[in-house]
Every structure is written in C-alpha cells, then in structure tokens.
From Swiss-Prot:
Keywords: Chaperone, Cytoplasm, Stress response. GO terms for cellular component: cytoplasm. Homodimer. Participates actively in the response to hyperosmotic and heat shock by preventing the aggregation of stress-denatured proteins, in association with DnaK and GrpE. It is the nucleotide exchange factor for DnaK and may function as a thermosensor. Unfolded proteins bind initially to DnaJ; upon interaction with the DnaJ-bound protein, DnaK hydrolyzes its bound ATP, resulting in the formation of a stable complex. GrpE releases ADP from DnaK; ATP binding to DnaK triggers the release of the substrate protein, thus completing the reaction cycle. PROSITE patterns: GRPE. PANTHER family: GRPE PROTEIN, GRPE PROTEIN HOMOLOG, MITOCHONDRIAL. HAMAP family: GrpE (MF_01151). Residues 1-37 are annotated as: Disordered. This is Protein GrpE. InterPro entries: GrpE (IPR000740), GrpE_coiled_coil (IPR013805), GrpE_head (IPR009012). GO terms for biological process: protein folding.
Length: 182
C-alpha cells in the first residue's frame, strides 16, 4: 500500500471514528434529553396533581365558609331569642295569675301573641310534646308520674315550653313522663 493510500485510509478511519464519536455524543445527548423530558413530564404530572388538590381544598374551604356564614346568620339571634322566650314565660305566668275578664289580662295576651308571632317569623318554634314519647334531644324529664293507661316514657305534662331555632334546639321542654305502676 502506498503512502497516499495509507494516508487516505487513515483519514477515512479518522473521519469514521469522528463520526462515530459524534454519533455517540448525539446519542448520549438524546438520551440525556429523553431523561430530562421524562423527568419534566413526571414533574408536570406532580404539579398537575398538586393543582387539582389545591383547587379541591379551596372549594372545600369555600363551602365550609359559606356554611359558617349561613349558620352565623341563622343563629346570630340565639341569645336574644333565649331572652325573649324567658320574657314570654313571664307573660304566661302573669296571664295564669290574672283572671280572664281582667282588662290587663287581655292586653298581656295580645302582647304575648304578637311576640310569639314575631319569634315564629324568625324561625323560632315552640316544642309541644304532650302525648309524644320522650326524646332526650328535645326534652328534659323532670318527674315520672305513674300512669298505667299510657306507654312508659309518654309525655303527660309540660312544665316549661321548649323551643327550636331553625330546627336546632334553643331550649329543651321540661316535661313529666309516664311510667307504669309495677
């Protein structure tokens, strides 16, 4: 082989090796790029998941806050309502003491009915449990009375009227319940 042929072969081999080296570098760069792309995709999935959770948490907080605001509006008058029902109890006691034909009795009766109507407009309802079975969520049993005609636990008398405000207990009814004579 001649020197020029050797030189061409060497040059050709050098070019092939250079090309192989460049191909390997390109392949290595492509592999690095693919790894980076895979990592970025995984990170995007994680961020998307975090975003979904954050949006869901935000919606939950919003719903809870709306419920709390609604409850605050509904039950803000609770203390005032308790004071008013105590006043109604006092008016009832006065009406029981006064005679029906007393003009003061009639005036108190009108005032009592007006207050009760106003309370009802604001979601405050009386609990009238006579004849119902005792329910510890709504009633407070004060006395048991023997009564063989009624089922045990039936409310036979109300000592103090109970009230609810928008279906939530404001004050339990104080009651006398029946029990069987053993």
């Amino acid at each position: 082989m001649s020197d020029s042929s050797k030189e061409r072969k060497k040059k050709f081999t050098g070019m092939v090796n250079k090309q192989k080296s460049e191909d390997q570098q390109n392949n290595s760069k492509q592999a690095d790029d693919l790894d980076e792309l895979k990592t970025l995709k995984e990170r995007a999935v994680q961020l998307e998941d975090h975003l979904r959770r954050a949006v869901a948490d935000n919606e939950n907080v919003k719903r809870i806050m709306q419920k709390q605001i609604s409850d605050a509006n509904d039950y803000a008058v609770t203390k005032f309502a308790r004071d008013m029902i105590d006043s109604c109890d006092n008016l009832k006691r006065v009406m029981e003491i006064l005679k029906d034909d007393d003009p003061v009795h009639e005036g108190i009766k009108v005032a009592y009915k007006k207050i009760m109507n106003d309370l009802k407009k604001h979601g405050i309802e009386e609990i009238d449990p006579i004849g119902e079975l005792f329910d510890s969520n709504l009633h407070q049993a004060v006395v048991e009375r023997e009564d063989n005609e009624k089922k045990t636990g039936t409310i036979v008398e109300v000592l103090q009227t109970g009230y609810t405000i928008k279906n939530r207990l404001l004050r339990p009814a104080m009651v006398i319940i029946s029990k069987k004579n053993c």
